[in-house]
């Protein structure tokens, strides 16, 4: 049965998708709590492996302690099974020395090795061409070997140290900003509460002064009214007393006038009567 062009195209698309999916290594969590990316299917030289890690925002792994080495060995056992050729992040900066004790450095950090897990008689810099470090598949204990950096093999990546340091510093800075903002917010709330209390106190004092002022004004008005009333009463009493005195004087004057008139009339009547009697005697 012949394949049609459509079938061929479908097969090619499936193959591309399958290959792309299979080629993406997955992060695996180790006993130390860190996540590592292990590539065993596709092969790269050391520099290509470095760039592959960078594409995933990672770096070739650095192993600074026995604990970290044991965690990675345990992870490789669980994920891969047996020992594999896997690039690590170390190299000797292309030293020409074949001395086993020549210095090696972790390229992601620039730090010299403080821990190593070399296989027997290594690092030997065979033919002066072995400058990059890897886990060796010929050693069941997952020991290290120096090899030509152009040899292709798998690799192990870990989170970028500088990115982690930057993220940690950024996180600490953000936390510090949050603490500062929280402190400022707390201080503002406390100041606002204090000002509110002071404003309430001032408002209450103003209200009290206003109330006291009203009371004093009322007292003054009452006192003024009482004083005016007293003055009016005293004035009325003086007028009444004066009127009564004038009336009494008038009555006394009338009485005196009456008495004087009566006396004058009586005296005049006596004189007139005597004169009449005299006239009668004469005439």
From Swiss-Prot:
Family annotation (CDD domains): CLECT (cd00037)
Keyword Manganese: no
Keyword terms, alphabetized: Disulfide bond, Lectin, Signal
Signal peptide stretch: 1-23
Keyword field contains DNA-binding: no
Any GO MF annotation of the entry: carbohydrate binding
SS bond list: 53-157, 132-149
Every C-type lectin domain range: 51-159
One Pfam family recorded for the sequence: Lectin_C
Classification via Gene3D superfamilies: Mannose-Binding Protein A, subunit A
Conditions for induction: By injury of the body wall.
Entries under SMART domains matching the protein: CLECT
InterPro entries recorded: C-type_lectin-like, C-type_lectin-like/link_sf, C-type_lectin/snaclec_domain, C-type_lectin_CS, CTDL_fold
Function noted in UniProt: Role in the defense system of the organism against microorganisms. This lectin binds galactose.
Name of the protein in question: Lectin subunit alpha
Species of provenance: Sarcophaga peregrina
């Amino acid at each position: 049965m012949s394949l049609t062009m459509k079938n061929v195209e479908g097969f090619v698309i499936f193959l591309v998708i399958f290959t792309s999916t299979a080629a993406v290594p997955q992060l695996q969590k180790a006993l130390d709590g860190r996540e590592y990316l292990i590539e065993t299917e596709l092969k790269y030289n050391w520099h290509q492996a470095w760039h592959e890690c960078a594409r995933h925002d990672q770096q070739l792994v650095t192993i600074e302690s026995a604990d970290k080495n044991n965690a990675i060995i345990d992870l490789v056992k669980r994920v891969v099974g047996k020992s594999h050729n896997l690039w690590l992040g170390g190299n000797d900066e292309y030293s020409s020395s074949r001395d086993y004790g020549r210095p090696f450095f972790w390229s992601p950090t620039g730090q010299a090795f403080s821990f190593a897990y070399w296989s027997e008689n290594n690092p030997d810099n065979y033919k002066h061409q072995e400058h990059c470090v890897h886990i060796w598949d010929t050693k069941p204990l997952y020991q290290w070997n120096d090899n030509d950096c152009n040899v292709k093999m798998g690799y192990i990546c870990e989170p970028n140290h500088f990115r982690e340091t930057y993220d940690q510093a950024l996180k600490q800075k953000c936390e510090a900003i949050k603490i500062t903002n929280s402190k400022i917010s707390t201080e503002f709330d406390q100041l606002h509460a204090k000002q509110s209390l002071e404003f309430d106190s001032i408002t209450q004092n103003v209200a009290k002064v206003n109330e006291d002022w009203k009371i004093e004004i009322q007292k003054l008005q009452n006192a003024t009214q009482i004083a005016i009333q007293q003055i009016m009463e005293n004035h009325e009493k003086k007028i009444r007393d004066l009127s009564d005195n004038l009336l009494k004087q008038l009555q006394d004057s009338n009485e005196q006038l009456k008495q004087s008139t009566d006396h004058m009339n009586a005296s005049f009547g006596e004189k007139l009567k005597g004169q009449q009697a005299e006239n009668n005697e004469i005439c």
